[in-house]
Amino acid sequence: MSAVAELRELGNRLRQQFSQNGRSKPRIIVGMGTCGIAAGAREVFQAIIQEVENRRLDVVVGQTGCIGMCQKEPLLDVQLPGGPRVTYGNVAVKDVPRIIASHVLNGKIVADLAVAYFADGGFHLEGIPSYDQLDFFKKQHRIALANCGHIDPESIDDYIAAGGYAACAKVLTEMTPEEVIAEVKEAGLRG
């Protein structure tokens, strides 16, 4: 088996694994970009780990990079199986037990801390804006930054599951140098 075929197989397997975990277990994701860390995200992350361990919860706890709402850091997302991913902002360590007790264990969103939710999946939450309704995000069409806030920047598995290295594999095995140059020119990369 070639390295490219192995990469494709690994990507498919990781996407399936992440999809199953995302559907079957609650997920808590903390924004751990430099802005989040400076605002206290590392302490919030540790408080989540401690609370999950103390309660013996079967929850996926992860991190992601900056999504772009630095003024609301630390950010914490909760997604229950079959539900929307809800973002909480300006989260303090003292808020962690309340978010876990209310949202993770009882499915009740903590409205005073909720800042937005991801509208993919056809969800609508009354009184909480979706990301595409927020002024900062509504006119954005993320291309190069499409994975920001969605993958763990320290996880090679997350990167591969999101299609990382696929373009490199294609360039090295399927395209001529002239085709690569034409592709880059046609892409119209900007920003």
Regions found by a protein language model. Give the residues of each.
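Feature of Fe-S/electron-transfer and energy-metabolism proteins
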Residues: 1-191
